Amino acid sequence: MKISIIGTGYVGLVSGVCFSEFGFNVTCVDKDKNKIERLKLGEVPIYEPGLEEILKKNTESNRLSFTSD
């Protein structure tokens, strides 16, 4: 299943990362290009325990991607 998340604020980012951890293919979309570039580098702009590690793991396995398009 493919899931799109609109917005990478606290709720959108955590939801998208968690869905990808469950095995879904997730694309997170945000209009803030700087935030998207940081997320692509594995930099998490919010504090949530363990989120950065899960994000990196699922980005590397191609289940999680970020775009501003």
Enumerate the language-model features and the residues they cover:
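Structural/interface elements that position substrates and couple domains in central-metabolism enzymes
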Residues: 1-69
